[in-house]
Amino acid sequence: MAVKVGINGFGRIGRIVLRNALQLGNIEVVAINDPFIALDYMVYMFKYDTVHGRYKGTVEVKDGKLVVDGHAITVFAEKNPADIKWGSAGADYIVESTGVFTTVEKASLHLQGGAKKVVISAPSADAPMFVVGVNLDKYDSKYQVISNASCTTNCLAPLAKVIHDKYGIAEGLMTTVHATTATQKTVDGPSHKDWRGGRSVNNNIIPSSTGAAKAVGKVIPSLNGRLTGLAFRVPTLDVSVVDLVVRLEKEASYDEIVATVKEASEGPLKGILGFTDESVVSTDFTGANESSIFDSKAGIAISKSFVKLIAWYDNEWGYSRRVCDLLVYAAKQDGAL
């Protein structure tokens, strides 16, 4: 049995959610909506990917549908979510991955077309936010619109939870060295709200704001107000890294912290929080399924209460895998799976 899903927005996350869904088998993508991508171009965009490689199965157009490995997917091209006939395609759960309809009010428009629930693949100002491995116990089936938070929050929150549960985080600062995303400029151009963000991504390290650290306080309330951070956008295509500096409430040696994280990665957070003690670099994590991979060799401590912790994440693939996990979890809790 599989949860029947529709995807709104066939961009980076939309396409990679589909790739993940095809791997997992417990999600059946029955419909895709994107008003800006013609069906034949949709085939091309899904088949070829600069980061994750060529799709190894079959991708074609047949009878006006996108057919992947023999599985037919209905395609819509509506600009208004309220006009998408999700119900006619049998799509119960919607992945809202346009980056546009990120509030409860806007995302709820999907419900008018027959959808039962919407998962926003981005942070939301007012939708309940969930991070797999951190706060799924707070999920309630009454929620019709939920958020999977951001890729960076998904990396940071599991690590922060492990450290906070064991040692207590008094306060912390996070920096994410973040790969390029689609909203950035290839050459210098206008960006009235974020002047630095208008500079070319190809030859710059660009400081940027991020709400990822503060958002951890929404999924771990006891950390609310204790974490904040910033981002540096760098000229790489994929895979990012979180640098978390924390002051601990309970003293611990760096080796003790490493042992704690490793234990969690092999136990309750297996598959969510990874662990490496090898001399790795960013491309070694392309296609990593985990939300966060702790790098024990990269962290440092200045004392038993002040430490820097490093965790890698594939901001495209790992995040999309969690979108799928959240869909399946919600469907099970709702009795739909």
Curated annotation (Swiss-Prot):
Positions bearing the site annotation: Activates thiol group during catalysis: 178
Residues at the catalytic site: 151
Pfam annotation, one family: Gp_dh_N
GO process terms (BP): glucose metabolic process; glycolytic process
Broad enzyme group: oxidoreductase
Any GO MF annotation of the entry: NADP binding
Record keywords: Cytoplasm, Glycolysis, NAD, Oxidoreductase
Protein name: Glyceraldehyde-3-phosphate dehydrogenase
Organism for this UniProt entry: Schizophyllum commune (Split gill fungus)
